[in-house]
Amino acid sequence: MIEKSDSALRVSGPMLIAGATGLLASGRGFLSSASRADGVVFDLSAVEETDSSALSVIFGWLRTAQALGVGMRIANPPASMISQAALYGVSDSLPLA
């Protein structure tokens, strides 16, 4: 689930393959309505569990943000996501805040 807070979009719950399509679509919706000047921060501090699909969702959001000319950052990624990114060799591509 994604909720808008004062300074970020707060992602909560699991980021697993079962919900990946919905999370991708929800995030894209927020990105499409975002201000180019302000950009978007996805706060992952409330994410409970991840699998490799979480990285796919993040990179999908990033492609959408780039296409729209909106800046995007990821804050507070869970350790499991950082480990998966390192395993797949994509750590440097994560837009960490």
Predicted regions: what they are:
Residues 49-59:
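Phosphopantetheine-attachment site and its flanking helix in carrier
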Residues 1-50, 63-97:
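STAS-like cytosolic regulatory interaction modules
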